[in-house]
Amino acid sequence: MNQEITNDEARERYEDIAHELAATHSDVELRKLFSMPAIYVKGKACAGFTQGKEMVFKLTGAAHAEALGLEGAHLFDPGGMDRPMKEWVVVPAAHAAEWPRLAELALAYVAGR
């Protein structure tokens, strides 16, 4: 379901997801990636929150294709130099309802679960 939310609401949703993952997975840490808040598992980044109202997820296979198929989603290009990180998908806040599930999928992928 698409819905418009504010920057503060988007950040709060990211924080809820990040803290829930950290509370339920002992190998999850909350750190920075490219100056943005990020979720790490086993020392590797799996998701983050951009300066805008977007979350980024490291995904593969069907999960990657599904996320990339969401309206407004695109590959993550942190430097804006047309060199996207191919496994990373930016998902706008209009799809914030999908963020928790995508975060779990990203965590599982990066952790090798």
Where are these regions (language model features)?
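Charge-dense, helix-prone N-terminal extensions
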Residues: 1-113
